[in-house]
Amino acid sequence: MNYRYDWWPYMQAIIKRYPDRQMIFDRLGEIQQREVNAVADAIQRTAELEDGMDRLRLIKSVYWTRHRKTMAGIAMELYISRATACRWKSEFVLNVAECFGLYIRT
């Protein structure tokens, strides 16, 4: 699913910047605040899923930790397949895009 949409890299960049921008939310412009809110909403939606906490651990490992691991390595830590890990990551990016207003589920 990578780069299927023109906005895909933009959504990934929004997700990567989320922890830093969350701390300075009041000083951000309107668009940056919308970006932070989109990621926060996607996190909330993901947490409500049955396997949401595992999905959030995956997202944290992929985007927000300094120790970079391969998708296969992260999947092994979570006891899921690499394909499932890739699907969860893609679903999270789509969720952020939906919360931001760039994607509509059909």
Residue ranges: model-predicted function:
Residues 10, 54-58, 88:
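Residue-level detector of well-ordered alpha-helical segments, enriched
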Residues 1-49, 84, 100-106:
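N-terminal interaction/assembly modules
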Residues 85-99:
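DNA major-groove recognition helices of helix-turn-helix
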Residues 44, 63-68, 93, 97:
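Amphipathic alpha-helical core segments of compact helical bundles
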Residues 50-69:
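Short amphipathic alpha helix immediately N-terminal
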Residues 66-81:
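Helix-turn-helix DNA-binding module
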